[in-house]
């Protein structure tokens, strides 16, 4: 990945008004990497080892009203503390929250959908209240108004604290007629605004965004959302944003979620840590379900300075903060307490720790099921570690699902981590055969999507499980995007620096595998994708297989106008008649989900696919062709209007075409960027897992004919002009307009 070990200090001087009496000041960190120690005027306010978690502290007693104050934050990343690139420093946002002494504390509301259908919903809100010393809760009242997605008030309730004001918590219930239920297809969000009064004086206003929906795991049936069965079409995501590193950025997250939604993905697993609040809020808005994960280690180490050193003292506090932070977010549909923890082999210790952590989740949030990703299915069914979970999650080894299902009282299995197929965008290896842990001199993997790791498999090995086994609840593929670090199977081999697992590469450009998943997961959009590219000088006359990924059942392939035959997806392939090693080597399961012409021979020209529907009607076609010499650069911005706020990035896809407009798949020209006007070049990436070109430098080589440039606005509205040049190529320019940012 990138260097991350070391110690850093942040210091901020600020003034506090002299008349600060009766006010409370709280610092909220969304995440600080890692081992944070926070000091105010030389006194330690709080420490928090976990670099991913949110934490907060009241700094009022440490302030110097009417004078200068010094906030200092010390962070330290230890060597051998992470299995992937964690980032470093204050990489998430920090908030100063100023309230009256009587106020709703941080994460002080909990909104639960007690029941919901299309006719009505019953919603309960619990609102905590912190009162000044010497005051009685009975002196206060709460008034809450609930507004629907259109901003209309649909419920209102006023309540005074009574003698039974347990734990300083107001409980209010609302009936909402004809509610808009939250789901991946209808991500409707409601807003609760609670006002705290002392007599007639407003003391605090607290806003909570929530969704009306129910979730449940039903024995023998699986997961239900709003009472309806649902299977997960999910991906695992590490938190880094490729060339931007670990720093959180809303526009980059939105860009990623948009690509995943278009693929048909409906869920994300935040592997293997607490997520950024921005990710969860965007998932709320866009209808992306979330498995919110906590730990990669419990008591037993994976790396020398990992979380196992903090688990005993900090696990409950970390888990409580995770749940309280996100318990009102409708996108979060389950909690995940661990990933492949070695404790699963430690006798009865694994089951006991599982139950302890799950019970903490249930105590803090009784509405969501709890899972964990276990990669030793035989062991965890034998020692009952899987049996104690609300939802047993298995990482890999789908061939062991059937026998372990018989030992599970829940009668369901979640593919909590699947596939780990490896590929490099635009790179193809011959001959086309299934390979485990292949290693090539160029440190790449084949985009024919037939290569995987020693513990993993190909996408269809999971597809067929979830299609043919009713007890399978769906899957979370490793991974949605390539990420910094873990370049398996090359491990520490120089110059490998990023993973090959992603369905989408580090530059945010879809690999061929994207279209395979899209053909399976997105039934609303047409998919018809041909691979490989058709520039194979030197392979004339040699066998060069052609694959088609499509959601149509049949297609015909033409090379230079000559039919290579029609292929139909083989629905006669089942999980039971394709489980042997001969079938695996023969790509038998792949025939059910992709169309393959294994004996086609290369000749320059055109490759065309014609797709047919179930009735045999030709309904779509696509053509690729052999490209000529690179001629011009093409720039395409994902958006042409962005906010002038310094952080609303535009993502510009860069490619090279020949004179006829055909993309050049082998182009590796170095592209130089010049950005003028109201913006600047923020970063770039080409998706090459073995490239050490700096992300921030405004020049980079194309990889397989493409790259992405990230353009940032200043805080001054205006026009941003991006110019790309390369010797011997026709230059390209794109303009992006940045407009004054609107205040929330």
Question: Residues of each region from the PLM?
Answer:
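Beta-strand-rich structural segments
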Residues: 125-129, 193-195, 546-550, 610-611, ...
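Short aromatic-acidic-glycine turn motif
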Residues: 146-155, 567-569, 574-576, 630-635, ...
């Amino acid at each position: 990945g990138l260097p991350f070990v070391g110690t850093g200090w942040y210091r901020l001087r600020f003034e506090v008004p002299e008349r600060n009496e009766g006010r409370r000041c709280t610092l909220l960190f969304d995440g600080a990497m890692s081992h944070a120690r926070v000091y105010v005027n030389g006194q330690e306010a709080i420490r928090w080892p976990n670099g991913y978690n949110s934490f907060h502290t009241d700094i009022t007693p440490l302030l110097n009203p009417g004078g200068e104050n010094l906030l200092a934050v010390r962070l330290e990343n230890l060597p051998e503390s992470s299995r992937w690139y964690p980032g470093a420093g204050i990489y998430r946002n920090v908030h100063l929250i100023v309230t009256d002494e009587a106020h709703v504390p941080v994460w002080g509301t909990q909104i639960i959908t007690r029941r919901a259908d299309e006719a009505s919903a019953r919603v309960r809100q619990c609102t905590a209240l912190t009162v000044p010393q010497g005051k009685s809760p009975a002196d206060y009242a709460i008034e809450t108004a609930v507004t629907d997605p259109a901003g209309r008030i649909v419920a209102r309730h006023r309540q005074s604290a009574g003698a039974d004001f347990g734990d300083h918590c107001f409980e209010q219930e609302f009936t909402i007629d004809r509610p808009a239920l939250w789901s991946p297809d209808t991500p409707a969000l409601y807003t609760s605004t609670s006002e705290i009064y002392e007599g007639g004086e407003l003391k605090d206003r607290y806003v909570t965004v929530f969704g009306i929906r129910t979730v449940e795991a039903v024995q023998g049936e699986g997961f239900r959302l709003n009472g309806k069965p649902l299977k997960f079409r999910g991906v695992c995501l590490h938190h880094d944003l490729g060339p931007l590193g670990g720093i959180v950025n809303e526009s980059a997250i939105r860009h990623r979620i948009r690509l995943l939604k278009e693929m048909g993905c409906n869920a994300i697993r935040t592997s293997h840590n607490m997520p950024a609040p921005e990710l969860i809020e965007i998932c709320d808005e866009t209808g992306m379900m979330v498995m919110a994960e906590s730990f990669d280690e419990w008591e037993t180490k994976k790396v020398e300075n990992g979380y196992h050193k903090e688990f005993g003292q900090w696990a409950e506090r970390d888990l409580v903060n995770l749940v309280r932070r996100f318990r009102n977010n409708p996108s979060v549909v389950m909690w995940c307490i661990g990933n492949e923890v070695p404790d699963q082999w430690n006798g009865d210790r694994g089951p006991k720790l599982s139950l302890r952590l799950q019970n903490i989740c249930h105590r803090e949030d009784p509405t969501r099921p709890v899972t964990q990703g276990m990669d030793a299915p035989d062991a965890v069914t034998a020692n009952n570690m899987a049996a104690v979970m609300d939802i047993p999650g298995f990482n890999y080894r789908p061939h062991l699902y059937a026998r372990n299902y018989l030992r599970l009282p829940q009668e369901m299995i979640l593919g909590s981590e699947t596939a780990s197929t490896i590929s490099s965008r635009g790179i193809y290896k011959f001959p086309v055969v299934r390979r485990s842990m292949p290693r090539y001199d160029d440190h790449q993997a084949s985009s024919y999507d037939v290569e995987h790791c020693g513990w993993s498999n190909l996408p269809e090995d999971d597809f067929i499980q979830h299609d043919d086994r009713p007890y399978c609840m769906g899957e979370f593929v490793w991974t949605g995007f390539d990420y910094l670090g873990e370049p398996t199977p090359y491990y520490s081999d120089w110059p490998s620096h990023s993973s090959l697992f992603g369905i989408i590469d580090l530059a945010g450009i879809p690999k061929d595998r994207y279209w395979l998943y899209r053909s399976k997961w997105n039934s609303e959009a047409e998919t018809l994708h041909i691979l490989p590219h058709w520039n194979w000088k030197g392979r004339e006359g040699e066998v060069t297989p052609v694959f088609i990924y499509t959601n149509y059942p049949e297609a015909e392939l033409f090379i230079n106008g000559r039919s290579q035959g029609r292929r139909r997806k083989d629905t006669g392939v089942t999980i039971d008649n394709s489980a042997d090693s001969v079938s695996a080597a023969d790509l038998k399961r792949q025939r059910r989900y992709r169309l393959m012409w294994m004996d086609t021979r290369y000749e320059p020209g055109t490759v065309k696919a014609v797709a047919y529907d179930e009735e045999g009607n030709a309904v779509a076609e696509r053509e690729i062709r052999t490209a000529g010499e690179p001629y011009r650069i093409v720039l395409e911005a994902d958006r042409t209007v962005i906010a002038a706020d310094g952080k609303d990035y535009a993502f510009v896809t860069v490619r090279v075409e020949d004179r006829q407009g055909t993309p050049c798949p082998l182009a590796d020209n170095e592209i130089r960027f010049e950005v003028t006007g109201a913006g600047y070049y923020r970063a770039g990436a080409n998706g090459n897992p073995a490239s050490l070109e700096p992300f921030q430098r405004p020049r980079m080589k194309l990889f397989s004919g493409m790259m992405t440039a990230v353009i940032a606005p200043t805080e001054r509205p205006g026009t941003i002009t991006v110019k790309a040049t390369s010797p011997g190529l026709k230059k390209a320019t794109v303009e992006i307009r940045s407009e004054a940012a609107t205040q929330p």
